[in-house]
Amino acid sequence: MKAVLTRVSSASVTVGDEVVGSIDCPETGGLLALVGVGAADEPDAWETMVRKIAELRILDNEKSVSDVGAPVLLVSQFTLMGKTARGRRPSWSDAAAGGIAEPVMRRIATGLRERGIHVEEGRFGAMMKVASVNEGPFTVLVEC
């Protein structure tokens, strides 16, 4: 499992003409979390990802999402699992199938909400337009 976590002051996901998720957090900052679920992920990898998203101290003043009550926009992104070492076309063989990845994404969202974190989500499997106002810019790659 991989995630790209970007510190943002706002972010949104649009499917067609509908905004399906958005966060606006100019005071605290928030995170845009693009998450790719791998075919070979350990069964508890989602728990580690929840902990990382909630507790990494990557907001202003070395605070975490949990520390300041910052929101998270969670978006599934299987392309993070792409392999590009050979040839000119990425291989998606390391990405989990939709039937496996979708419940994992739901577990991550639920796990964050159980910690009291406000979570907005993209729409699994949809073609989405993701907009964000990056702060810093500050972006980290997390692998579980």
From Swiss-Prot:
Note the InterPro entries from the entry: Daa-tRNA_deacyls_DTD, DTD-like_sf
Q: According to the UniProt entry, where does the motif Gly-cisPro motif, important for rejection of L-amino acids sit in this chain?
A: 136-137
EC number(s): the record gives 3.1.1.96
Q: Which reaction does it catalyse?
A: glycyl-tRNA(Ala) + H2O = tRNA(Ala) + glycine + H(+); a D-aminoacyl-tRNA + H2O = a tRNA + a D-alpha-amino acid + H(+)
Q: Which Gene3D superfamilies is this protein grouped with?
A: D-tyrosyl-tRNA(Tyr) deacylase
- Keyword vocabulary terms for this entry: Cytoplasm, Hydrolase, RNA-binding, tRNA-binding
Entry's Gene Ontology molecular function annotations: D-tyrosyl-tRNA(Tyr) deacylase activity; Gly-tRNA(Ala) deacylase activity; Ser(Gly)-tRNA(Ala) hydrolase activity; tRNA binding
The principal localisation class reads: cytoplasm
- One GO location term (cellular component): cytoplasm
A Pfam family: Tyr_Deacylase
GO aspect biological process, one term? D-amino acid catabolic process
Q: Look at the named UniProt entry and state the broad enzyme category this protein falls under.
A: hydrolase
SUPFAM superfamilies reported in the protein's UniProt record: DTD-like (SSF69500)
Source organism, top-level taxon: Bacteria
Q: Where in the cell is it found?
A: Cytoplasm
How does this protein assemble? Homodimer.
* Record's function text: An aminoacyl-tRNA editing enzyme that deacylates mischarged D-aminoacyl-tRNAs. Also deacylates mischarged glycyl-tRNA(Ala), protecting cells against glycine mischarging by AlaRS. Acts via tRNA-based rather than protein-based catalysis; rejects L-amino acids rather than detecting D-amino acids in the active site. By recycling D-aminoacyl-tRNA to D-amino acids and free tRNA molecules, this enzyme counteracts the toxicity associated with the formation of D-aminoacyl-tRNA entities in vivo and helps enforce protein L-homochirality.
Q: Which family does it belong to?
A: Belongs to the DTD family.
Question: What's the entry's take on its domains?
Answer: A Gly-cisPro motif from one monomer fits into the active site of the other monomer to allow specific chiral rejection of L-amino acids.
- Name of the protein in its database record: D-aminoacyl-tRNA deacylase
The source organism is Corynebacterium efficiens (strain DSM 44549 / YS-314 / AJ 12310 / JCM 11189 / NBRC 100395)
| Lineage per the UniProt record | Bacteria, Bacillati, Actinomycetota, Actinomycetes, Mycobacteriales
Q: Which gene encodes it?
A: dtd
